[in-house]
Amino acid sequence: DVERLQFSDKKVALDFSANALETLQFIGVIAPALQGNLNVRGTVLSLFDQGKSMQEMSQLALDLGLITSDNTALAKTVFKNVFNTTADPDQNLTNALVEFIEQNGDAKFLATVAGLNINVDLVGLQQSGMEFI
């Protein structure tokens, strides 16, 4: 199976059930405004291609300060990122998310939410692949 195509100006990942999908899942949770950035896609994809897990990538994002590590702020930020909203989740949902973070850790929380495929265009990815540089 062909997983990657290379052109003179860009590359296309066709492995929509593996690393390309994880790349978009990860970016969608951490920084959805960067989902269209081909350089960011390429960098993240290369880390997944090197064998990094979603949880390792999530921990890296936390270590680099790419996303807050305060439990309440993390819960609210991820909610806003995934659902593309400026509104905070209601207090009950915030409390449930914070409880998950406290019990499982912030990297596990990010990895779990990323795996939900909420903020990923699966149809577009399957039809045309994921462009990156």
Q: What is each of the regions a protein language model found here?
A:
Residues 4-133:
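Substrate/cofactor-recognition hotspot
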